[in-house]
Amino acid sequence: MNPIVINKLQRKLGYTFTHQELLQQALTHRSASSKHNERLEFLGDSILSYVIANALYQRFPRVDEGDMSRMRATLVRGNTLAEMAREFDLGECLRLGPGELKSGGYRRESILADTVEALIGGVFLDSDIQAVEQLILSWYASRLDQISPGDKQKDPKTRLQEFLQGRHLPLPSYLVVQVRGEAHDQEFTIHCQVSGMAEPVVGTGSSRRKAEQAAAEQALIKLGIE
C-alpha cells in the first residue's frame, strides 16, 4: 500500500497504528484477501455502539430510552459512517478485489461504512478501550453537538410514512430493482415511488431494509423535509 496515502489517512483519523498490519487488515475487503476486515468490523460495531450509547447517556440525563435509541441509531447507521469515511477519503485506501474495483466498490456506502467499523476494531486491538473511545468521540464531536431528541430521530421510512399519512396521501411503495454480489456481501437497490413524484427515488444498502431506509431518506430530501 502507498505509504504516503496511508500516512495521510492516519493524520485524518487522528491515530497512528503501532501495528500497521491491523490497519492493513481493516482496509482489506473480503474480495481482496482471506485476511479481510470482517472480524474487525464485528468488533468495531459493538465498540461504536457502546461509546455512542454512553455519550448519549451522559449528555441527556432526562431523555428516555426510546429517544436515546433513536439518536444512537441515527449516529451509527450506515450512511452516517459512509459520510465519515468520505471525510477521511477512505475510498482511496481500500484494498478491493478486481471485481469490486471494476464495479466502483470504493464508492459503495456499505463497504465504506463497514471499513470505518473495522478501523475502530483495529484501533481497539492496537491500543485500549480508553484510546478508542476518545478517538470515536473526536470523530463524532460535531454530530453529538448537533443531535437532539425528538421526531427527527425516527427512521426515514417512519418519517416518510407519517408525512404522507398526515396529508392523506397513499403510502410509498418500495421495489427491489437490483441485487448485486454474493450472499455474504450483497448490495440491494430499491426504487421508492411516492405520490406526487414523477420519478421514483433510489436507495442502496447491504440489506433490503437498509436500502429502503436510504430510498426513504432521498424521498424526504426531495420533499424538502430533510
Swiss-Prot record:
Location, primary (coarse class): cytoplasm
Cellular compartment(s): Cytoplasm
Keywords: Cytoplasm, Endonuclease, Hydrolase, Magnesium, Metal-binding, mRNA processing, Nuclease, RNA-binding, rRNA processing, rRNA-binding, tRNA processing
An annotated Gene Ontology molecular function: double-stranded RNA binding
InterPro entries to which the protein is assigned, alphabetical: dsRBD_dom (IPR014720), RNase_III (IPR011907), RNase_III_dom (IPR000999), RNase_III_sf (IPR036389)
The DRBM domain, residue ranges: 155-225
PROSITE patterns membership: DS_RBD, RNASE_3_1, RNASE_3_2
Cofactor: Mg(2+)
Active-site residue list: 45, 117
GO cellular component terms, semicolon-separated: cytoplasm
Binding partners and assembly: Homodimer.
Function: Digests double-stranded RNA. Involved in the processing of primary rRNA transcript to yield the immediate precursors to the large and small rRNAs (23S and 16S). Processes some mRNAs, and tRNAs when they are encoded in the rRNA operon. Processes pre-crRNA and tracrRNA of type II CRISPR loci if present in the organism.
Name the record gives this protein: Ribonuclease 3
Encoding gene (name): rnc
